[in-house]
Amino acid sequence: MDGIDFATTRINRDLALLLKSRVALYEGTFLKYFKGTAFVPNGEGWPGKSKEYNANYEYPSGNIDNEINFFLDEAMAASKEVAEKYKGQLTANTGMLQQAADDPENPYYNMFCDEDLSSYPEVLLWRQYTMNKGNDIALAANMGNWGVGITRSFVQNFLMADGTPVYTHGTYADGDGYYMGDQTIADVRTNRDSRLSLFLKEPGQTNIVWDDQPGQSLNLIEPVPNIIVGDMQRAYTTGYALRKGGALNSKYCIQLKGYVALVCYRAVEALLNYME
């Protein structure tokens, strides 16, 4: 079946290999880091030893070290096959949020709010929607994530653009001039990992570039986070909100009728699994 192009809304070989690498990596590293403890068979205090059906348990490969090597080898082989195929086809992130119709598009941003993901090679599986069977992905991103805010500690976990952690740059509140502190959202986004600076919403940003479905009660321009409103659809519970999935066209923001696609699995995970 090699050479046949399958719709990536269905299970395919590359997806199966990715899942194989994920499971094998988990199993191998779990055995490796919990070796000798009660969390793995035959470890100190392992409760399975007291069960008649497990009293003489032996690993299929002979011992735990062989088992670890088996799973890690399988993870490496499966992830390498996918990684080699897609390493030159990952979606580019310009780091910029499109703010006007004549601004350059950011393919990475669009990958999470497009209606058809078949043009993104790294997306190995995605879910398609229609207006009759829709979602509220784009609408939630346009609002305050419907009362599910991210925490300050979550934001602080993102590295700086140069790969250094935030805590090496002065205080969390004030920074050192490279890390700008967190007095404002604009400061938080400055010189950060491009995924944070792209997806963390900032007051004053344009949320809707094309208003093809006017008359909706949308945030065309991102407001100051409203943390006291009682309407959970518009509530910003922490002051930090994400725009991932936030389509720039209002036609995708009709309640219960949005049809931006949902990314399920991406080939980039295979590269990460292989490196690990």
Which role does the model predict for each range below?
Residues 4-7, 60-68, 257-261, 274-276:
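Second-shell loop/turn segments in exported
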Residues 1-5, 89-94, 252:
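Glycine- and aromatic-rich loop/turn segments at beta-sheet edges
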Residues 19, 78, 195, 273-274:
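Short, hydrophobic/aromatic alpha-helical segments in well-folded domains
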Residues 10-14, 24-226:
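An aromatic- and glycine-enriched ligand-binding surface/loop that stacks and positions planar moieties
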Residues 217, 222-266:
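Active-site beta-strand/loop architecture of penicillin-binding DD-peptidases
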